[in-house]
Amino acid sequence: MISIDSSAMQTEAVDLANLPAQDTALEIRNLDLRYGDKQALFDVSMKIPKKQVTAFIGPSGCGKSTLLRCINRMNDLVDSCKIEGEILLHGQNIYDKKVDVAALRRNVGMVFQRPNPFPKSIYENVVYGLRLQGLSNRRDLDEAAERSLRGAAIWDEVKDRLHDNAFGLSGGQQQRLVIARAIAIEPEVLLLDEPTSALDPISTLTIEELITELKQQYTVVIVTHNMQQAARVSDQTAFMYMGELVEYADTNTIFTTPKKRKTEDYITGRYG
């Protein structure tokens, strides 16, 4: 089993099956997803607690990134995709026809595997979403830029070159800039799809430290192939295999005393 430093665990384990509505950020109910004739998710149900870090782990192709992208309807961009079931945010199914998808994605931000800054200045990257929302007051934009860059733990590194091109930053800095851009519009939920897979170990550590800070303000859901990373940063872990949610519990339980044989086999490296 993977050892976990209990001193690093920031929150107490919660009863995920009986999580009260006021403590639930998202609830996924009986979710199925198909790409054409191929089913990628099978009857997934889970509750994701507010202001904690939930990790999705599992072997390649298990459906973890597919599930993550369901949470802000990124899979809508795939023509052959068909979804059944519900994902509830504030008690409303985000797949209801009345839902404003653009508004949903403002409330549920996403950061991808590779840093994707825009070909603009550092400053304009951060305030881009705010400008789209109609914010034009320079003082308000300046305050939002500083707040977001501080929130992404990169302010001290860029405060004297805010108007330099974002492509001049290192990979790790670019990823933190992208996180700053995501939190500038103040989402409730932040989705991270393997956010450190393209980064060096030092940059990875910086992002992991940032994730533990982000949950003070946001609900964070992370997909990672790195089990040690999941053990370090998450409060809950969901293990997925072949499109099914095999086991979902507090991270300490998943990595030390899993209840399902498939989970134990994956954690101990018997496959994956």
From Swiss-Prot:
CDD domains noted in UniProt: ABC_PstB_phosphate_transporter
Keyword Cytoplasm assigned: no
Enzyme Commission number: 7.3.2.1
Membrane topology note: Peripheral membrane protein
Swiss-Prot/TrEMBL catalytic activity: phosphate(out) + ATP + H2O = ADP + 2 phosphate(in) + H(+)
Localization, UniProt: Cell inner membrane
Main subcellular localisation: membrane
Listed InterPro entries: AAA+_ATPase, ABC_transporter-like_ATP-bd, ABC_transporter-like_CS, P-loop_NTPase, PstB-like
Assembly information from the UniProt record: The complex is composed of two ATP-binding proteins (PstB), two transmembrane proteins (PstC and PstA) and a solute-binding protein (PstS).
Name the UniProt record assigns to this protein: Phosphate import ATP-binding protein PstB
